[in-house]
């Protein structure tokens, strides 16, 4: 899943 900063999903954290 795609989670920006872990908001949606803690899989991919993009800051």
From Swiss-Prot:
Keywords: Carbohydrate metabolism, Cell wall, Chitin degradation, Glycosidase, Hydrolase, Plant defense, Polysaccharide degradation, Secreted. It is found in: Secreted, Cell wall. Its EC number is 3.2.1.14. The keyword Secreted applies. GO terms for cellular component: extracellular region. One of its GO terms (biological process) is defense response. The keyword Hydrolase applies. It catalyses: Random endo-hydrolysis of N-acetyl-beta-D-glucosaminide (1->4)-beta-linkages in chitin and chitodextrins. GO terms for molecular function: endochitinase activity. It comes from the Eukaryota. Defense against chitin-containing fungal pathogens. Belongs to the glycosyl hydrolase 19 family. Chitinase class I subfamily. This is Endochitinase 1. It comes from Taxus baccata (English yew).
């Amino acid at each position: 899943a795609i989670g920006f900063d872990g908001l949606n999903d803690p899989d991919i954290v993009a800051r």
